Every structure is written in C-alpha cells, then in structure tokens.
Swiss-Prot record:
Dimer of alpha and beta chains. A typical microtubule is a hollow water-filled tube with an outer diameter of 25 nm and an inner diameter of 15 nM. Alpha-beta heterodimers associate head-to-tail to form protofilaments running lengthwise along the microtubule wall with the beta-tubulin subunit facing the microtubule plus end conferring a structural polarity. Microtubules usually have 13 protofilaments but different protofilament numbers can be found in some organisms and specialized cells. It is found in: Cytoplasm, Cytoskeleton. Gene3D superfamilies: Helix hairpin bin, Tubulin/FtsZ, C-terminal domain, Tubulin/FtsZ, GTPase domain. Belongs to the tubulin family. One of its GO terms (cellular component) is microtubule. One of its GO terms (molecular function) is GTPase activity. CDD domains: beta_tubulin. Its cofactor is Mg(2+). GTP binds at Q11, E69, S138, G142, T143, G144, N204, N226. SMART domains: Tubulin, Tubulin_C. This is Tubulin beta chain. Mg(2+) binds at E69. Transmembrane segments: none annotated. The lineage of its organism: Eukaryota, Sar, Stramenopiles, Ochrophyta, Bacillariophyta.
Length: 443
C-alpha cells in the first residue's frame, strides 16, 4: 500500500490539518473515536493510505502534529476529532516561536526537532511502502515556516527517495497577520525550492474571495477557508485512496507537473464551488466542471493564471463519468486557449479520474496548475522583503537568534532568481532553443 505520512506544523498548519482529517475521516467513514461506520467496502479498501489500523479495529491517522507552543494543539485535541490522533504524535514546546523564522529554524525549533523526527521514524516504520510526506504549514509565521522547513530538510536527508509535498499558505497581499511575514516567507521559499518536490501554493486572500464572491458567505471564518483547502488536499490524493479509471499518485503528479526541478510551485483550484443556496439549480456536467476549474476565480492563490502561461497542469476528476468526455474537454480547453499553454511541452495537460466523488456530490474536480503566473506572488513578497531589508527593519530579532545578514541576502537573490526563471520560461518559444544554449555558454 502506498501510505502518506501527514505532518502539520504551527498554528495555521494544525488548523488546516484538523479540518483535513475531518474531511478525510468523513470520506472513509471513520467516526471521531476511530471506529468505522462506513457504507461501502471501497472506503476500507485503501484506508491505510492515511490511517493505521490499531488493535480492536480502531483507525488512527498517520499524522504528526508539531508546534512550539501548546495552545493550538490543545484546541485540536478539544476539537471534534481530537480523540482520533495518537497522543504520542503531539510534539510541542512551551515557548512559542513568536512569528520569528529564526526561532523556528535555528533555536527553539532545533531543540524540538529530534523528538519530531523520532515520531516521523515511528510512523514511517509502520508503513508498508511509504509513498511520501505531506506537510501543511504557513510561510509567514515562525513555527510552520521556520521549523517546517527545518523538518523538510532533515526528512530529505533521511528519506531522499520519498516524495515531499507541502501545502503552504503564502502571506497574502491584503490580509496580513504580522509585519515580518515577507522575511519569513522569503526565508521559507529559499528552503522549499531546494528541499521539496511539490508545493501547493495557497493564500488567504484568494480563499476569502472564493468564500465571499462564489460561496456568498458574508463573514468567512478561518474554518471556512480551511474547509476549502481540505477539499483540495483530499482531491489531490483521492486516486491513491479509491479505485479509478486513470490513476494518479504523488510521484506521478510530480513527474508530470515539474518540468524544471526548481519550478515546483503549483496553483490549486477546486470545482464545483457554488453557494449552498444555488446548488440544486445547476447541473454538474464534465464541461461545466472543466470550465469552472480553469476559471481564475476558483484559484486558491492570489495570482491570475491569465497573466502567465501554463507549463503543465493536471485535472483530477472525481465521480462516475465517461473518460471519453474528459479527454474531449481537456482537448477543448487546450485548443480554445492554446496561448495560455507553452507550446514547447506537448500534451501538457494531464487528466485523472477517480470513481468515488466527495461526500454529498456527484462529481468534483481538483485542478493543479504549474503556471508562470505564480511569480506574481513571489514578486509581491520579494518587494515587501526588499523594502524592509533595505532599512534593516526588524532584523535584530533574527540576528539575535544567531542568523547572519548574508542569509537574508542569499534568500532574496534566490527568490529573485526564481521569479526570473519563471519569466524566462514564460517568454520562451519552441523555436528559440538554439539561442538559449548560446546564452548559457557565454554566461
């Protein structure tokens, strides 16, 4: 079985994670105590991708929860599915990282990391044939960003051949929680570029917009946002957990989605997104789902795919549908909007079909796109970073934890390199191949 070990770090990561496990348990018919109450054998067939079966038929999530302060953990434990998790898998410190990346990565986090790695090893050993890890975290904080990236690099050393995928909440342009977000995010990207295989970029502003515009929620809470993220995360792994006509797993996704190793930041979309009131007035058809999931309004990241070009994308369908229709729709999209796809990667749209839809729906799709437009997000963060770093504002918090200014400069230039790489491939055309090689030789 292809198991996935789930890790959640920091406040944001733990809250997304808690919601994710609610959705996951619901899909597999597991109640908050870990007992199975499902109605179909399909729910049990590959339940051990995410769950471990304990004595007495209890299903326990393969989840590791870490934080540098006990607060969020306590609320997860007190939440509806708090009793589901294995108590030993809660690893937390007492001090907190205080939104300081250096504390999470170098001081406080480094003290706690060994106990987290012990739990990771335990979970990995209980797997039959582990496929990889998934981490939910934010990039703007201290624990999720600093300690999360530290954990990724440690796991990378120990399990170099396993897929590492992250669901990273990027600081959004309008909704800011802390002043030092640009610092934390830039330092995190510096790590993720090197050590992760695929990063699903999410941000709160785009999620707010979806809740507000599409779902017609007047006052969206973090719970609503996290529910959207959870739906998308479940969609990216459904083919591992349920039978399908065209399967897709984390590694297949990575191979098909990442044309150049550094460019592994994806935008995620989900369909159908309709407000609760208008659900019954719309027919869910494959064309409608396809059209919706390519729509810029459905992207969970505040970058507009129309401003860039898709290097690759994958559409993961769920539900009973004809594969012929899916293929037709995919062709249709590529032919109609061919200018949005780079022409030097033929067949760069991958579709997969999983037969079991999410709870309460007949069909759904998750969209994962590797578009050059994601550079907008990094550009924005880099600009904010530069403005503060030029004045060395707030820098003493980081140097006080033993960081060097040089590290900031490196992270900044790595971020700028990433942006210009995206731009280079956005401008590249199929017949320019020769010119590129010459440039590289001269350089």
């Amino acid at each position: 079985m292809r198991e996935i070990v789930h890790i959640q770090g920091g406040q944001c990561g733990n809250q997304i994670g808690a919601k994710f496990w609610e959705v996951m348990s619901d899909e597999h018919g597991v109640d908050p105590t870990g007992t199975y109450h499902g109605d179909s054998d399909l729910q049990l067939e590959r339940i051990n991708v995410y769950f471990n079966e304990a004595t007495g038929g209890r299903y326990v999530p393969r989840a590791i929860l870490m934080d540098l302060e006990p607060g969020t953990m306590d609320s997860v434990r007190a939440g509806p599915f708090g009793q589901l998790f294995r108590p030993d898998n809660f690893v937390f410190g007492q001090t907190g990282a205080g939104n300081n990346w250096a504390k999470g990565h170098y001081t406080e986090g480094a003290e706690l990391i060994d106990s987290v790695l012990d739990v990771v090893r335990k979970e990995a050993e209980s797997c039959d044939c582990m496929q990889g890890f998934q981490l939910t975290h934010s990039m703007g904080g201290g624990t999720g960003a600093g300690m999360g990236t530290l954990l990724i690099s440690k796991i990378r050393e120990e399990y170099p051949d396993r897929v590492m995928s992250t669901y990273s909440v990027i600081p959004s342009p309008k909704v800011s929680d802390t002043v030092v977000e640009p610092y934390n995010a830039t330092l995190s990207v510096h790590q993720l570029v090197e050590n992760a295989d695929q990063c699903f970029a999410l941000d709160n502003e785009a999620l707010y917009d979806i809740c507000f515009r599409t779902l017609k929620l007047t006052t969206p809470t973090y719970g609503d946002l996290n529910h959207l993220i959870a739906a998308a995360v479940c969609g990216t792994t459904c083919c591992l957990r349920f039978p399908g006509q065209l399967n897709c797993d984390l590694r297949k996704l990575a191979v098909n989605m990442v044309p150049f190793p550094r460019l592994h930041f994806f935008m995620v979309g989900y369909a159908p997104l309709t407000s609760r009131g208008s659900q019954q007035y719309r027919a869910l058809t494959v064309p409608e789902l396809t059209q919706q999931c390519f729509d810029a309004k459905n992207m969970m990241c505040a970058a507009d795919p129309r401003h860039g070009r898709y290097l690759t994308c994958a559409v993961l369908f769920r539900g009973r549908m004809s594969s012929k229709e899916v293929d037709e729709q995919m062709l249709n999209v590529v032919n109609k909007s061919s200018s949005y796809f780079v022409e030097w990667i033929p067949n760069n749209v991958k579709a997969s079909i999983c037969d079991i839809p999410p709870k309460g729906l007949k069909m759904a799709t998750t969209f994962v796109g590797n578009t050059t437009a994601v550079q907008e997000t990094w550009k924005r963060v880099a600009e904010q970073f530069t403005v503060m770093f030029r004045r060395k504002a707030f820098l003493h918090w980081y140097t006080g934890e033993g960081m060097d200014e040089m590290e900031f400069t490196e992270a900044e230039s790595n971020m700028n390199d990433l942006v210009s790489e995206y731009q280079q491939y956005q401008d590249a055309t199929a017949d320019e191949e020769g010119e590129f090689d010459e440039d590289e030789m001269e350089g």
